[in-house]
Design a protein with these regions (language model features):
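ABC-family P-loop ATPase nucleotide-binding domain
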Residues: 1-13, 221-230
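H-loop (His-switch) and adjacent beta-strand-loop-beta switch element
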Residues: 211-224
């Protein structure tokens, strides 16, 4: 049996002043799963995203990506692991307006192992996967909100990551575009991509096959049947 795409073991994250943003969180996400992590504002979702994505280190416990314990890695190795195995999608897109859709997607390949001559081909392939094959040369500011988020998703998947972390991916979109983005994430998952959606919206969470709930930094529910405790 293959290792989980992502595993957290007794993870805690404390901030100065004794504020516990996460407390004893344990979970495992298997390859090709589609998972919602849901909670209200202040529940610890953003901190959990940062810890899962190795953007922040836990105060206690361990984070394993594809079976690799991140505690054993130095900063350079951790950055390399993140770039090779994790794709991020953020609510605010994080695109560069002066660049085309293709160029924005190519930025994800600048520091990886993809040869320069292959980067444009990889970017175009990713944009075709998200339905933007006709928008390759459009600059980011010329795209609609839904199209901009599709570019962001293409950038997240262009490295063929083990895991995609989507933080409130519909938060800046209207209902129709938000529905289209969720349909796209579900399609990518059906093609084998492991997707974790972080959201405050229970309607979004309820449409996904597995739901993990956070409250005050604790994992309090997991629809997979895994133990949850406060």
């Amino acid at each position: 049996m293959s290792a989980p795409a992502l595993e957290l073991v007794s993870v805690g994250r404390d901030y100065p002043g004794g504020v516990a943003a996460l407390a004893d969180v344990s979970l495992a996400i298997q390859p090709s799963e589609l998972v919602a992590i849901v909670g209200r504002s202040g529940s610890g979702k953003s901190t959990l995203l940062n810890v899962m994505g190795t953007l922040d280190l836990p105060s206690t416990g361990s984070v394993l990506i594809g079976g690799t314990d991140t505690r054993s890695l130095d900063d350079r190795q951790l950055s390399s692991l993140r770039g090779d195995t994790i794709g991020f999608v953020f609510q605010s897109f994080h695109l560069t307006d002066g660049l085309t859709a293709e160029q924005n997607v190519m930025t994800a390949l600048l520091y990886g192992r993809t040869p320069r001559r292959q980067r444009a081909d990889r970017a175009r392939e990713a944009l075709h996967r998200v339905g933007l094959g006709a928008r390759l040369d459009h600059r980011a500011q010329q795209l609609s909100g839904g199209e901009r988020q599709r570019v962001a998703i293409a950038r997240a998947i262009v490295t063929d990551p083990l895991l995609v972390l989507a933080d409130e991916p519909t938060g800046a979109l209207d209902t129709t575009n938000g529905e289209n983005i969720m349909n796209l994430l579900e399609t990518l998952n059906s093609q084998g991509t492991t997707v974790v959606v972080i959201t405050h919206d229970r309607q979004i969470a309820d449409r996904l096959p597995r739901r993990i709930e956070l409250r005050d930094g604790h994992l309090v529910a997991d629809s997979s049947g895994a133990a949850a405790h406060v």
